[in-house]
């Protein structure tokens, strides 16, 4: 079988399954609760957060976990817009982004007053860097191009 939908769901690597197995079978407590059974889950998440922060040079408080890419895209765009809206309201993206980006940009346009520029791409999916440069204004607060 040839599987061509890895952008949506990718087979889990065997070493990841092995590392996660204890959390599927023994330590499956809700890490957000206060009872003792959840302590192992909470500790594992805290350790993972610190490890990721160390690898990328961030603070552990800057590491967030979401349910997946769409939620992450949605959260990143909305949070960035809200955090920087006092500096501008312009977002740049492309016409071929994932729907999580496009739908969130549409929401920000309609409901939050964002101005969004949707760049064209060439036959290979690349943007023209000159067009990107021309699209940037003093009001630009976010560029989201995958």
Residue ranges and their predicted role:
Residues 1-146:
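Pyridoxal 5′-phosphate
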């Amino acid at each position: 079988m040839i599987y061509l939908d890895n952008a949506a769901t990718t087979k889990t690597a065997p070493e990841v399954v092995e590392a996660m197995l204890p959390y599927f079978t023994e330590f499956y407590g809700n890490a957000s609760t206060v009872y003792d059974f959840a302590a192992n889950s909470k500790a594992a998440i805290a350790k993972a957060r610190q490890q990721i922060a160390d690898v990328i040079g961030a603070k552990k408080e800057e590491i967030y976990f979401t349910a997946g890419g769409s939620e992450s895209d949605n959260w990143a765009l909305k949070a960035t817009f809200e955090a920087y809206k006092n500096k501008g309201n312009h977002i740049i993206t492309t016409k071929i982004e994932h729907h999580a980006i496009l739908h969130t940009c549409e929401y920000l346009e309609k409901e939050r007053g964002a101005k969004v520029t949707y760049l064209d791409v060439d036959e290979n999916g690349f943007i023209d860097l000159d067009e990107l440069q021309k699209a940037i204004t003093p009001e630009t607060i976010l560029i989201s191009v995958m």
